[in-house]
Amino acid sequence: MVKYGVVGTGYFGAELARYMQKNDGAEITLLYDPDNAEAIAEELGAKVASSLDELVSSDEVDCVIVATPNNLHKEPVIKAAQHGKNVFCEKPIALSYQDCREMVDACKENNVTFMAGHIMNFFNGVHHAKELINQGVIGDVLYCHTARNGWEEQQPSVSWKKIREKSGGHLYHHIHELDCVQFLMGGMPETVTMTGGNVAHEGEHFGDEDDMIFVNMEFSNKRFALLEWGSAYRWGEHYVLIQGSKGAIRLDLFNCKGTLKLDGQESYFLIHESQEEDDDRTRIYHSTEMDGAIAYGKPGKRTPLWLSSVIDKEMRYLHEIMEGAPVSEEFAKLLTGEAALEAIATADACTQSMFEDRKVKLSEIVK
């Protein structure tokens, strides 16, 4: 039996706990969240810890799942590692490369597993795209273009996710696409340039994050990527487009469908595990449930069908690793800290680029 403790049991943390508990040989034993732990503890038959220290030092915990707000990941990860606990941490791992480095180093020094919650890697369509690329089907990857944008209306209250100091803004909080591009390109770019600003969401009823950002990445061997995020787009889009020397792949997460284009012919594949899940995601994007290209959850709310399925898949993989299964090559970077470090390093370089109005080399961040 592998015993799990969860730090942060709001919307996403509670769902991670629920789906981990479904696995044979997995038990959620201890929860820590001063505001939200009681209800999910009662549901799962777990105990509530009175402090973070109580949870990470407990003999009833083998692995700690960290799902606090983004700016509060560092302390539980490092304390868990220092107590010899394996760690799963939600994305973004940290809001600075230095913090991320300290978290990864703490896990290495204490010889514990550290898994980054970069959940997009568990999408069926992303896995299939990686397979096609590795098999040389579309030739050499020359260029990637991602967009994750929509229009955000005023909300009853300002979520922590809209406060840059707490979430990191779109760049860090929605780091999935950046991470995905770096997986597809084989690592970090050599240089980045970021521009953007808050063009339509200023005032007391909104947070302080930029609602339009644009990132240009330059990789080795004349390869490029363009990424855009934001909540000031009346024409919403969400996709990853991969241009190769022989063909192209489009992962459309708005009108949910994967497309392979070769020799002028198109073939299609699922983004998620079933047509029902793809249709569920398409329906949500075209309904009023989305806001600014993201459905912001809140404690007590359940994830939609497509997201529940991929959480289930991610938690099942984590549990298999905890039970001693070998780490697959595809996900190796998620369990060495490399994916976490590369994603945050690039995000930091982008942030520096915008504030200093210049192109930034990744070597300035990763020294």
UniProtKB/Swiss-Prot annotation:
Keywords: Oxidoreductase
Alphabetized Pfam families for the sequence: GFO_IDH_MocA, GFO_IDH_MocA_C
Enzyme class: oxidoreductase
Record carries keyword Oxidoreductase: yes
GO molecular function, one term: nucleotide binding
Record carries keyword Glycosyltransferase: no
The enzyme's E.C. designation: 1.-.-.-
Family note: Belongs to the Gfo/Idh/MocA family.
Protein name as annotated: Uncharacterized oxidoreductase SP_1686
